[in-house]
Amino acid sequence: RSLYGGTHNLLESTLSRIGNTTTYEEPRDPAAFAAAIQDNTKLVFGEVLGNPGLEVLDIPKIAAVAHAHGLPLLVDATFATPYLCRPIDLGADLVMHSATKFLSGHGVVIGGVVVDGGTFDWMANDKFPTLSQPYAGFHDLVFAEEFGPQAFITRARKEGIRDFGACMAPMTAFQILQGLETLPLRMQRHVSNALAVAEFLQEHPMVESVSHPGLSSHPDFEFAKQILPLGAGAVFSFELRGGREAGRVLIESLELF
């Protein structure tokens, strides 16, 4: 309930085919993250705002857990955007966004962003040989020696784009940059609109529950003010009384989308 379905499918169905395994824990429990780390663990991952439960990730504490075990913390900040949350300032090492959503703002492109804070020492242990050992594809270059904390993002560009085709079209990049120009203004309105609708639904007799960290009924209401001081996001989930049939009726009755 706290991980985007596409990400779960990538971890569980795609990466598992090439030998990667994933252990899942509740985002509110840093101790559980610590207990789940194994000798072969390479990365700790979480979403600033879980999808669809909207749980708020305790970035500082989970970053401390990851770093204590010599691991980087990767955070998906798609729902939060850089306007509402700065994960690197809170301890994350890597941040990813689906730029299709709030960053571009118009739903006309498909793209993603990876941000490397340059905070992780890839030479600190032997868990990352692709960065700490010679790479034949670049004349035995050792990325971590040559580029230091920027080794990850450099290899992502030099190898990932070159060999795996993750190269954004120029027009797509242009449209995302255009969207970024209005991100602060749009997020302010997105946040206020979402909270207004969530408050309305919370009082509606046909609604069983609403999950949004901006509501006092949400378990992370107070904590969200620390991680997301400018607003608890513009996405919420809700459950209807009447189950699946009630959901069908609601969707088919919508006149404005």
Predicted stretch roles:
Residues 202, 206-257:
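Conserved C-terminal alpha-helix-loop-beta "cap" of PLP-dependent enzymes
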